[in-house]
Amino acid sequence: MSEELSKKHTNRLNKLQKRLRREVGSAIADYNMIEDGDKIMCCLSGGKDSYAMLDILMNLQQRAPIQFEIIAVNLDQKQPGFPEHVLPAYLEKLNVPYHILEKDTYSIVKDKIPEGKTTCSLCSRLRRGTLYGFAQRIGATKIALGHHRDDIIETLFLNMFFGGKMKAMPPKLLSDDGANVVIRPLAYCREKDLEEYANLKEFPIIPCNLCGSQENLKRAAVKDMLNQWDRQYPGRIETIFTAMQNTAPSQGVDREQFDFVSLTRDPDAPMRGDVAEANLPAFDFLDIANSGRIDLDAAKRIDIVNTYEV
């Protein structure tokens, strides 16, 4: 690598590193992900996202005003051809405590899922159960997963399109049994930034080949849709994620999230003006200085010229 290219490489890495650290720091602060004395079990798959998460958390650990412990954990699911030496060598080079777990979930998945069908759901459930149990065993107070902003948005659309639910991946989650807290420090990070960061840092990526033809998965189709939107309408993905953080249950249709049944009007509420607001055409009385709300003083000045009552 020439000196000029090396300088560009370093400058780009530094810029990207600062952005990712800032985004991770913001997510941690916004959701109170890490507290003083925490023991963080950082789950590594060997993919770009989990490598980046560990790298950034280790850097923040050195700078944070609080003390917390990081333990890296990888689950070897006994996939054929899995390079068992890669992660131990990398983690020992970093001098980070780690555990490599072994559980043959590969055989279970292949036995239970017909050929050609998506294995991700069962695979993730088996993996989650193993990691949850091990976290309790070592006394981990938080389990850190490497899901990023794109994963969260994709999951929302997957659940909308194929599950009929407005449900995504929360940045912080309490397990159903209450025994584990899951955190996603990369919740504010873009996948393309993490991919570039992994390339610049030259992480020893281990590809997942268990699922076979990944491009046939529903998630890949949703990802393509979102990528197309991002190209055609820059800023749309950011707006979607912002909207996910600004929900209004009273403006939706989910009866579990808001008690519509008990909604009643207050007959004693004071009336503002001679004419009820609901009877006024909003566009006639918009007060620009009042955030687009109806100018009730103007409404009050209307003369009622005709009334018919039965």
From Swiss-Prot:
Q: How would you classify this enzyme at the top EC level?
A: transferase
| Coiled coil spans | none
Q: Which cofactor does it need?
A: Mg(2+); [4Fe-4S] cluster
Gene Ontology CC: one annotated term: cytoplasm
Listed under GO biological process in this entry are:
tRNA thio-modification
Binding residues for [4Fe-4S] cluster, per the UniProt record? 120, 123, 211
Q: Keywords for this entry?
A: 4Fe-4S, ATP-binding, Cytoplasm, Iron, Iron-sulfur, Magnesium, Metal-binding, Nucleotide-binding, Plasmid, RNA-binding, Transferase, tRNA processing, tRNA-binding
> Where, subcellularly, is it found?
Cytoplasm
**Binding note for cofactor:** Binds 1 [4Fe-4S] cluster per subunit. The cluster is chelated by three Cys residues, the fourth Fe has a free coordination site that may bind a sulfur atom transferred from the persulfide of IscS.
Recorded GO molecular functions are: 4 iron, 4 sulfur cluster binding; ATP binding; magnesium ion binding; sulfurtransferase activity; tRNA binding
- Give any Pfam family that matches: ATP_bind_3
Recorded catalytic activity of this chain's protein: cytidine(32) in tRNA + S-sulfanyl-L-cysteinyl-[cysteine desulfurase] + AH2 + ATP = 2-thiocytidine(32) in tRNA + L-cysteinyl-[cysteine desulfurase] + A + AMP + diphosphate + H(+)
Q: In which pathway does it act?
A: tRNA modification
The EC number(s) this enzyme carries:
2.8.1.-
User: What residue intervals hold the motif PP-loop motif?
Assistant: 45-50
Keyword tRNA-binding part of the UniProt annotation: yes
Q: Which family does the record assign?
A: Belongs to the TtcA family.
Record's miscellaneous remark: The thiolation reaction likely consists of two steps: a first activation step by ATP to form an adenylated intermediate of the target base of tRNA, and a second nucleophilic substitution step of the sulfur (S) atom supplied by the hydrosulfide attached to the Fe-S cluster.
**What is the documented function of this protein?**
Catalyzes the ATP-dependent 2-thiolation of cytidine in position 32 of tRNA, to form 2-thiocytidine (s(2)C32). The sulfur atoms are provided by the cysteine/cysteine desulfurase (IscS) system.
Q: Quaternary structure?
A: Homodimer.
Name listed for the protein in its UniProt record? tRNA-cytidine(32) 2-sulfurtransferase
